[in-house]
Amino acid sequence: MEESHFNSNPYFWPSIPTVSGQIENTMFINKMKDQLLPEKGCGLAPPHYPTLLTVPASVSLPSGISMDTESKSDQLTPHSQASVTQNITVVPVPSTGLMTAGVSCSQRWRREGSQSRGPGLVITSPSGSLVTTASSAQTFPISAPMIVSALPPGSQALQVVPDLSKKVASTLTEEGGGGGGGGGSVAPKPPRGRKKKRMLESGLPEMNDPYVLSPEDDDDHQKDGKTYRCRMCSLTFYSKSEMQIHSKSHTETKPHKCPHCSKTFANSSYLAQHIRIHSGAKPYSCNFCEKSFRQLSHLQQHTRIHSKMHTETIKPHKCPHCSKTFANTSYLAQHLRIHSGAKPYNCSYCQKAFRQLSHLQQHTRIHTGDRPYKCAHPGCEKAFTQLSNLQSHRRQHNKDKPFKCHNCHRAYTDAASLEVHLSTHTVKHAKVYTCTICSRAYTSETYLMKHMRKHNPPDLQQQVQAAAAAAAVAQAQAQAQAQAQAQAQAQAQAQASQASQQQQQQQQQQQQQQQQPPPHFQSPGAAPQGGGGGDSNPNPPPQCSFDLTPYKTAEHHKDICLTVTTSTIQVEHLASS
């Protein structure tokens, strides 16, 4: 036979639960029931055994409170004793999560002006009022919501469970011992901050309502959400630091005001970013889809979507000539006209052709004079045929120059002006467009036209045309001078080459003359120079009597001749002596 799991030793039996412990257990059970039920609004099914609150006989009711026990209930708790207990049914209320108290057998509570036998049981209404006054006889039906709180005898402080509309529990204190019933007074609200666990005079800890939320719970709930709201404009942020930085914008001075609207800003950089909304400037372009943005942060956020998967799925149409992709076939067809050079849209006024219909529509406004884009700046009545021209014009009013040169850090209002400026950094482009009034030179006709507006002549167009013609003539003259210089250099090179050739010929002739023998030494049988005519030399030089056959060079022959001549002179001198 197996041993029973029940420990028969009375030493290990649990102690008899107190009144406060039964209240906490009952409230915990009711809370679990509310959470497990699918519909909290429906009524609770009656339990198999009614929930009983055991009040010991030693605990007496407050002054003026008594129970009508005409018929006592026979249902007791396992640890209760019929001779020393009185039972009160505690009925849970689903709508509030609290409990109503009533007599288990009688139909109502009766208020009597009897003497108080000690503070052991306290009954309050949901609003927090203490039902202990014996001023008049009052009856409370069993359906009335009553809240029960009990303490051991001898304690003077009584805990009262407040209504759910209050977040901070209030404490009622009653001065015990005297006759006529004790009166209760509401204590002031405790200070904010972390609450310490207080102990009652009886030595038991103070009981709080587990269903009432405290201010600390609300703060924790806000921290879990990770959102911070600005008190001035109700904007929400995900970090406290961002909210603090934003809140400074409501308190700091804002001297920079927008000329188009009433907004003001704390510094000039914020104002410059805001002005781009009015001017339409978008200097930051995407390298993938050529979209433009006003701020660098917007461009960085946009480039995140350009992954490999995004390009393959969103832009499946790829150009066969380059690496560009497009979302649909119409965009691809427009792009292919760049490679093929096709321009199907022709102008009916000047027979110009364009690749896109929108370009033709913009061009026809030049002939018709239609200028739908007008400047809204006060005092400015200019109108433009294209939106881009209007946006560039607005930047002149706003003094916004987002297009900057990387070489000299100069800024411009549009990309075309920046491209013209970048050409000045190259050596090929020279300043050929000169003003006829002040003789200033510029690298492009656009800059010259802008400069001519400053002089404000009577006929600006004629002046510009004259300046352009003068620039063309100057350019032609410069080209002619360059050609003349090139021809002169070629002639100089030819003359130098001829002179060098003549010098080489002279050197060769001199070498040949040095190699020939002296004219007065000739080999026997050699004909005299000058031919056999009558112009022969009357005093011919003496001929050499030596045979030159064994001598290969004239130098050797010359040495021999000199030696023979010297020896002959010596012989003649000896003979004469």
Swiss-Prot record:
Residue ranges, annotated region (Disordered): 171-225, 501-550
Gene3D superfamilies: Classic Zinc Finger
Composition-biased stretches (Gly residues): 175-185
Keywords in alphabetical order: DNA-binding, Metal-binding, Nucleus, Phosphoprotein, Repeat, Transcription, Transcription regulation, Zinc, Zinc-finger
Biological process terms in GO annotation: regulation of transcription by RNA polymerase II
Example of a GO cellular component annotation carried by this entry: nucleus
Recorded family membership: Belongs to the krueppel C2H2-type zinc-finger protein family.
Function: Transcription factor that binds the consensus DNA sequence [GC]AAAAA. Seems to bind and regulate the promoters of MMP1, MMP3, MMP7 and COL1A1.
Name by which UniProt lists this protein: Zinc finger protein 384
Taxon lineage: Eukaryota, Metazoa, Chordata, Craniata, Vertebrata
